[in-house]
């Protein structure tokens, strides 16, 4: 699943990152306590968070214009 975050503003990126972090934390707890329906979802969310972190860092360094 390829996400397109390029059209997001900086505030949207930060909000989406926070949302994904909460979702990832919930999935981690579910995997420890019980059964997770889609175990690959954790990996997808983790990679999306990394993509957003990279884009936010690029914005701060002036590489990317939002």
UniProtKB/Swiss-Prot annotation:
Entries under CDD domains matching the protein: Ribosomal_L29_HIP (cd00427)
Molecular function per GO: structural constituent of ribosome
Keywords, comma-separated and alphabetical: Ribonucleoprotein, Ribosomal protein
One GO cellular component term: ribosome
Record Pfam families: Ribosomal_L29 (PF00831)
Origin: domain of life: Bacteria
Protein name: Large ribosomal subunit protein uL29
UniProt similarity note: Belongs to the universal ribosomal protein uL29 family.
Transmembrane residue ranges: none
InterPro entries hit by this protein: Ribosomal_uL29, Ribosomal_uL29_sf
Biological process per Gene Ontology, one example term: translation
């Amino acid at each position: 699943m390829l996400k397109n975050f390029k059209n997001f503003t900086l505030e949207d990126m930060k909000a989406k990152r926070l949302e994904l972090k909460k979702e990832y934390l919930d999935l981690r707890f579910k995997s420890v306590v019980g059964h997770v329906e889609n175990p690959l979802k954790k990996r997808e969310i983790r990679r999306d968070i990394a993509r957003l972190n990279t884009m936010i860092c690029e914005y701060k360094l002036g590489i990317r214009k939002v």
